[in-house]
């Protein structure tokens, strides 16, 4: 049976993504000076105000107000009529240190309190919280990501690009994209059914003008010719007007675009957000590692689709459970595949941080256009450097 599946993305000027970028810009500034800092920073944006709150334990000093303003201005909110102005907005900060009760479990995992020996200081790290994290990969795109979310991200990136470089001069920073893909009976994407773009714009431009520009400069360069047909629907600003945007139109909050950040709804989500969190928080680091595992399994040709769920207890280094699902696409025995994954990959938070080199100021750029499927050497969880080991485990 054929089916339709839809995913959305948003531009860097969307209020929730602004909040994510501010939180991660603060994290980067701290971790650059103090890689072992503990950071959990949330941002709320509304008309004329940015509020930053959270828990930070660090030896570093950072100018929160300056970081907020520079991030907002870099996104493109340089005038109040756009819905926010980085120069004139109020910035309120309420940051305190990490709870000592939480620090007890993160600084020294439960296993080592019970007498186990740590091979290495960093492997003493316990999970910063309980929860479950999911990783996924599919061979339907070269990025080994679901096609709907990849196209939605690419449209959103192109929308921001043509705004910033002046190709489409009447655009403003806020915007959203959405792509509906038709899949055939074999779960292969066969066509784009619907493309939706809602973009903030100057007040004196008409919808036909916006549509013409977006089709020419955004949609045509991104949507592959082989996935188009005469029945493909294009929707541009279907409300008819999108002049007021940004935090003046909608309150922005860190962690409210977790499906955009991951796989566009193609698989479950454990609920934990990424931005503003240092890598001892498994909400972030274990999600990255789960993607790393899934991508390597699919890249090795062991399955066409691969999902993994990993679950943790706060203060405990080793996961409480690991579950895999190949959706019937495994090329090897699935039970053996699970065992091989558990043997080859070390899911302890300290080992994850070490393997993926996560104690670096790399997070601001993850905070818009997806954390996965990106071609950037700093996104170490996108490497496929475990393919040889995985194949060897199956004598391939």
Curated annotation (Swiss-Prot):
- Cited Gene3D superfamilies: 3.30.300.10
Role? Catalyzes the formation of S-adenosylmethionine (AdoMet) from methionine and ATP. The overall synthetic reaction is composed of two sequential steps, AdoMet formation and the subsequent tripolyphosphate hydrolysis which occurs prior to release of AdoMet from the enzyme.
- Please identify the protein, giving its name as recorded: S-adenosylmethionine synthase
Taxonomy of origin reads: Bacteria, Thermotogati, Thermotogota, Thermotogae, Thermotogales
Q: Per its UniProt entry, what is the enzyme's top EC class, as one word? A: transferase
Q: State whether it acts alone or in a complex, and with which partners, per the record.
A: Homotetramer; dimer of dimers.
Q: Where is this region: Flexible loop?
A: 98-108
Example GO CC term: the record gives: cytoplasm
Pathway membership, UniProt: Amino-acid biosynthesis; S-adenosyl-L-methionine biosynthesis; S-adenosyl-L-methionine from L-methionine: step 1/1
Q: Where does K(+) bind?
A: 42
Cofactor binding note of this UniProt entry:
Binds 2 divalent ions per subunit. Binds 1 potassium ion per subunit.
Annotated localization: Cytoplasm
Binding annotation for ATP: 14, 174-176, 241-242, 250, 256-257, 273, 277
Write down the SUPFAM superfamilies for this protein, in alphabetical order. S-adenosylmethionine synthetase
Single Gene Ontology BP annotation: S-adenosylmethionine biosynthetic process
- Which positions are annotated as binding L-methionine? 55, 98, 250, 281
Q: Where does Mg(2+) bind?
A: 16
Q: Which keywords annotate this record? A: ATP-binding, Cytoplasm, Magnesium, Metal-binding, Nucleotide-binding, One-carbon metabolism, Potassium, Transferase
Give the molecular function GO annotations. ATP binding; magnesium ion binding; methionine adenosyltransferase activity
By sequence similarity, the record places it as follows: Belongs to the AdoMet synthase family.
Q: Which domain of life is it from?
A: Bacteria
Q: What is the catalytic activity of this protein?
A: L-methionine + ATP + H2O = S-adenosyl-L-methionine + phosphate + diphosphate
Q: Look up the EC number in the record and give it.
A: 2.5.1.6
